[in-house]
Amino acid sequence: MNPAVIIHSRTEEQTRAAVVSPLTMIASDGFIENGRGHPRTSGSYAKVLGKYVREEKALSLMDAIRKMTLMPAQRLEARVPSMAQKGRIKVGADADLAIFDPATVIDRSTYEDATIPSAGIPFVLVGGQVAVDSGKVTAARAGKPIRAPLGTR
């Protein structure tokens, strides 16, 4: 048995206020272990795009993308210089791209099954390698660890 404890400490109104705040960046530390995890593991970004951008119009698409890409990269790059290659689309930057349909993107993962992929995200490139192709995870071992230089922690 692999028990988990999940505590719901915020109301939906508090979550919405945090999501739309200009000071808030959106990131996730979720992971899957032994087939179990939290729904945010595969659903955080799709939930923001589907619920808060499309359905509730609480946030513009461009603001949401900035909060999920550029803001976290900028926050970390002072200590982790390689983050200056993240969260941006430009020559020389890491090619980490998610291609999604704003009309259909939505989270589908649940507390019972956090591995259910989000809908409306047909392609994902990590380091220029196709990691999701036509909505299916590929066998590519794309990406690389991001580490702070020694002595900066």
Roles of regions detected by a PLM:
Residues 1-57:
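Active-site neighborhoods of metal-dependent hydrolases
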